[in-house]
Amino acid sequence: IEAIRCGGSRDCYRPCQKRTGCPNAKCINKTCKCYGCS
C-alpha cells in the first residue's frame, strides 16, 4: 500500500476514509497510519 504523506493527523482523515471507509487515522513520521473502522 502506498504511503500517504501528512503534516498532521487531520491530513489523513479524508484519504484514510477513502481507503478504509472510516476516518480513524494518525500522522506518524510524516506518513498516515489508517486504523479503519473500530
UniProtKB/Swiss-Prot annotation:
Keywords, sorted A to Z: Calcium-activated potassium channel impairing toxin, Disulfide bond, Ion channel impairing toxin, Potassium channel impairing toxin, Secreted, Toxin, Voltage-gated potassium channel impairing toxin
Disulfide bridge positions per record: 6-27, 12-32, 16-34, 22-37
Pfam family, one: Toxin_2
Site location (Basic residue of the functional dyad, important for the interaction with Kv1.2/KCNA2 channel): 26
A GO cellular component annotation in the UniProt record: extracellular region
Site feature location: Important for the interaction with Kv1.2/KCNA2 channel: 10, 19, 28, 30, 33
Tissue: Expressed by the venom gland.
Site positions (Aromatic residue of the functional dyad, important for the interaction with Kv1.2/KCNA2 channel): 35
Locations listed in the record: Secreted
GO molecular function: ion channel inhibitor activity; potassium channel regulator activity; toxin activity
Stated role: Potently, completely and reversibly blocks voltage-gated potassium channel Kv1.2/KCNA2 and Shaker B (Sh). Also blocks small conductance (SK) calcium-activated potassium channel (KCNN).
Family: Belongs to the short scorpion toxin superfamily. Potassium channel inhibitor family. Alpha-KTx 06 subfamily.
Entry note about domains: Has the structural arrangement of an alpha-helix connected to a beta-sheet by disulfide bonds (CSalpha/beta).
Other remarks in the entry: Negative results: has no effect on voltage-gated potassium channel Kv1.1/KCNA1 and Kv1.3/KCNA3.
Protein name: Potassium channel toxin alpha-KTx 6.4
